[in-house]
Swiss-Prot record:
GO BP terms: melanin metabolic process
GO molecular function: scytalone dehydratase activity
Organism: Aspergillus aculeatus (strain ATCC 16872 / CBS 172.66 / WB 5094)
Gene3D superfamilies for this protein: 3.10.450.50
Assigned EC number: 4.2.1.-
Active site, renumbered: 81, 107
Domain of life, source organism: Eukaryota
Pathway info: Secondary metabolite biosynthesis
Annotated protein name in UniProt: Scytalone dehydratase-like protein AacuK
Sequence similarity: Belongs to the scytalone dehydratase family.
Length: 176
């Protein structure tokens, strides 16, 4: 495909189904469900909050990262990935589509396993570029790049432990 085009309605529906499964699996911490909706390799650009880009992360590594106790696997962390109704879709090849989605992601971390006391809140507002790939006839979640425009509360502290384990150190040097 030489020039990106608008995908057909059925392909958009397939991508929306993958997007829904991705968001729900994150929020319910259902890692088997996540495994069913992802592509064999993913582009994960978490520079917005982990300062890390994985150009081609194998699905098993992605599942390990997502379910890590320092990341979304922490049972004291509750999330809600809201995807806005205003989305843009571009078909970049026969088996690849890029979606641009409005996002709000709420995070709440609890002080105890009984989830009785909120220790930290942090919500991110913005958009996400999400890549989809058709694998054996089914559209799959193939990567994400969040774009955080603004945040509420202590969003920068939600994944502090995850940034230490999974991310890259921040550099004050100019990359000019």
């Amino acid at each position: 495909m030489a020039k990106p085009t608008a995908p057909c309605f059925e392909d958009v529906l397939g991508c929306q189904a993958a997007l829904y499964e991705w968001a729900e699996s994150y929020d319910t911490k259902d890692w088997d469900r996540l495994a069913q909706c992802i592509a064999p390799t993913l582009r994960i650009d978490y520079r917005a909050f982990l300062n890390k880009l994985w150009e081609e992360m194998p699905a098993p590594e992605f599942l390990l990262m997502a379910s890590d106790l320092k990341f979304l696997g922490n049972r004291r962390l509750k999330t809600q990935h809201f995807v806005g109704g205003a989305s843009k879709w571009l078909q970049t090849s026969e088996d690849e589509i890029t979606g641009q989605h409005q996002m709000r992601v709420a995070h709440q971390k609890y002080a105890d396993d009984a989830l009785s006391e909120v220790a930290l809140k942090g919500h991110a507002h913005g958009h996400a570029t999400i890549w989809y790939r058709r694998v054996e006839g089914q559209w799959r979640f193939a990567g994400i790049e969040p774009g955080i425009r603004w945040s509420e509360y202590d969003h920068d502290r939600i994944f502090f432990e995850g940034e230490e384990k999974l991310g890259e150190p921040q550099s004050d040097e100019c990359a000019c």
